[in-house]
Amino acid sequence: MKLSNLLLFANVGTLLVKATDENISPNEENTPRYAQFNIDYSVLDQPNYDPMAPMEFENGENITLAFNFANNEEVPVKLIAVGGNIINARSGDEVANITRSSLGEIEVDVNTSVSFNQAINLKLDEGDYFLLPNVFVLKEGELMAVGTSPSRIKILPPPMSFFNPKFLSIQAVLIGVISYFTYFIFRSSKKERRGVVSKTKAPKKVKLDESWLPENHLKK
């Protein structure tokens, strides 16, 4: 799925795509269809959720989407499952599918709304993505995927392990630097102590020439 298609999903209108190929005439096959559904969702793991601001997660992390589905059609519908796609923000290509999870046929009457949660596992490489959930709706026996607005997500680099070679090399450099400065400070301190000791030594006795002294000043 390219980015141009992704932006189409972000509009207020809801684009419907049939989930089965039954009863599709050639004229209807490429014709987008719209329905009177309003779907909003937030991310429970992000208290200050903003669909335009990137949300940061780690690879393999689970997130929970809180949906609100409003049925403005003239007939009741049933919510069957949640699925969707994940789009690379740079290339616009689809990189993963959101595993379809059953909702157990939640019935939604005319002009009513329901709320439900769905957990999604993010198994992605480091980078920026668009999350595009779909809700599968059963209307008068016809199953369709109802697109929602995209959310931006950012997968963070994995935390560096203590035994990671890069981390070990950093440790070796730090240990070397600390050892060098410790040795340098120790040598400098030792030299200073030697200097103080040499300055405080008792003066040497000087032998005087007594030949010029009077006899009465000479020690007996």
Swiss-Prot record:
Membrane topology, as annotated: Single-pass type I membrane protein
Keyword annotations of the record: Endoplasmic reticulum, Membrane, Signal, Transmembrane, Transmembrane helix
TM spans (from-to): 167-186
Regions of this protein lying in the Cytoplasmic compartment: 187-220
UniProt topological domain (Lumenal) ranges: 20-166
Cell location: Endoplasmic reticulum membrane
Main subcellular location: endoplasmic reticulum
Signal peptide: 1-19
Record's GO cellular component terms: endoplasmic reticulum membrane
Highest rank taxon of the organism: Eukaryota
Family: Belongs to the IRC22 family.
Physiological role: Is probably involved in a pathway contributing to genomic integrity.
Protein name per its UniProtKB record: Increased recombination centers protein 22
